[in-house]
């Protein structure tokens, strides 16, 4: 039987351990840091978590995170409404925004097709994307999904689905490492991939 800490400290370690990218040792380090941190720092963290759960929602139009819907991008009249960039997660929107190369709109799918994790097309925000393409305002859809197996499968699926709609479907140019996440791409590489996009 594995040894565990007593009560509240083990509960905190377990809670941190459920966060993505944090293993058991990292969770233990964070928990013990919080134990020795000033009380106001621990309170600030707890309040920030409660506040984000209470205030943050998903944009009714694009699926990005926001405090009120529509999000600032969808509400901005200066954005190019003829182009929609499709991404997996809200964090990908920020990665592309940091490049300062893109002035269109976004559509956040909420993931990618992944049969191993039981995520299929029905689990993604695909119907709302199709609804946004019903008019003739959108001329191009940019597939900016992670360059991994799941992202490629989702790009392929969406390209086939969108072909009959009559919009131009493009994808980011090469330059992003295969198997990586957009979140970790530097602004210059991502900006060049966006500027050099090609037909899907």
Curated annotation (Swiss-Prot):
It comes from the Bacteria. Residues 82-177 form the Toprim domain. GO terms for molecular function: DNA binding; zinc ion binding. GO terms for biological process: DNA recombination; DNA repair. PROSITE patterns: RECR, TOPRIM. InterPro entries: DNA_Rcmb_RecR, Rcmb_RecR, Rcmb_RecR_Znf, TOPRIM_dom, TOPRIM_RecR. Keywords: DNA damage, DNA recombination, DNA repair, Metal-binding, Zinc, Zinc-finger. A zinc finger (C4-type) spans 59-74. May play a role in DNA repair. It seems to be involved in an RecBC-independent recombinational process of DNA repair. It may act with RecF and RecO. Belongs to the RecR family. This is Recombination protein RecR. The lineage of its organism: Bacteria, Bacillati, Actinomycetota, Actinomycetes, Bifidobacteriales.
């Amino acid at each position: 039987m594995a040894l565990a800490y007593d009560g509240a400290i083990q509960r905190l370690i377990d809670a941190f351990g459920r966060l993505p990218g944090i293993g058991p040792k990292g969770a233990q380090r964070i928990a013990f840091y919080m134990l020795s941190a000033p009380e106001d720092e621990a309170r600030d963290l707890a309040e920030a978590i409660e506040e984000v759960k209470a205030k943050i929602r998903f944009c009714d139009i694009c699926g990005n995170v926001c405090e009120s819907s529509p999000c600032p991008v969808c509400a901005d009249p200066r954005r190019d409404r003829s182009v929609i960039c499709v991404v997996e997660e809200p964090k990908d929107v920020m990665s592309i925004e940091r490049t300062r190369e893109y002035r269109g709109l976004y559509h956040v799918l909420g993931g990618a097709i992944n049969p191993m994790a039981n995520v299929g097309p029905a689990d993604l925000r695909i119907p709302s994307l199709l609804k946004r393409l019903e008019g003739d305002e959108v001329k191009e859809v940019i597939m900016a999904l992670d360059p991994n197996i799941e992202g490629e499968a989702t790009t392929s699926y969406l390209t086939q689905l969108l072909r009959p709609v009559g919009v131009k479907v493009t994808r980011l140019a090469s330059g992003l490492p295969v198997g990586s996440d957009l979140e970790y791409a530097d602004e210059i590489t991502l900006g060049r991939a966006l500027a050099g996009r090609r037909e899907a």
